[in-house]
Amino acid sequence: MTLQNAPLPSLSWSLVTLFGLQTVLGLVQWRLHPSRQAASTDKGVKKSSSSGDSSSSVFSVLNTSIAIGAVGTLICHIFAVLFGAGIFNQAKETSQLAVYLSLLTFYPASFILGTDLKSWLRIFVHNSPGTYTEAAFYCQGMMTIFGAWLGSIVIPLDWDRPWQAWPVPCVLGAFMFYCIGTVVGLVVSIVMRQRAARSEFGIGPGTGTAQAGSKKNKSE
């Protein structure tokens, strides 16, 4: 049973695997995120009660992320229909594509962004991520959607190949460009960190000239 010959069962198994991997990665990112660490230190939680609080908070974050992922699935399904997918024809395949796209875009970002609607709109609608993590999520999400759209180009071609069945090309394109977006997001995050470090230590274009001018004024 392969993705080409049996799209529905194969996509179902791949979705279960992808959900597990994205959940583990999302929880790890959530625990290591600076905002969570700052919040835990500000509250001054004792070590004796930290385990119970952390377990309850993990379930809370997981429930929130699953809910956001479900909303993301609905949004992806609507956009798939708007871009030409049938409303009733092959609805199961379209739904699985929507779940796949949501697991690659909405679900991982929900562990950090949560229910902060302003952050979601600022990053994905206004195209202005402000932190390294937000830049990585933005690159992953945009590249995933672009890959799914690019994969749909080969569906109407008369090649008569099994992998042209809906929604196999879109899934393959989304996953391939998600991997590319992960690399691009990593590079963008590194560049943003380097620029932030340079500005913090006063290293940047024109800095040396400004410092030399200030020293000259002081000597005069």
Where would I find each of the regions flagged by the language model?
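Non-transmembrane, juxtamembrane loop and terminal tail segments
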Residues: 40-52, 197-220
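Cytoplasm-facing ends of alpha-helical transmembrane segments in multi-pass membrane proteins
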Residues: 26-34, 91, 100-120, 139-141, ...
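Membrane-helix boundary/interface segments in integral membrane proteins
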Residues: 115-132
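Canonical alpha-helical transmembrane segments
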Residues: 19-38, 76-79, 110
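Membrane-helix interface/capping segments
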Residues: 30-53, 118-121
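Structured partner-binding subdomains within large eukaryotic complex subunits
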Residues: 135-139, 157, 161-204
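Transmembrane alpha-helices of multi-pass eukaryotic membrane proteins
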Residues: 5-22, 56-70, 88-106, 132-143, ...
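Membrane-lumen (extracellular) interface motif
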Residues: 1-15, 31-35, 75-98, 115, ...
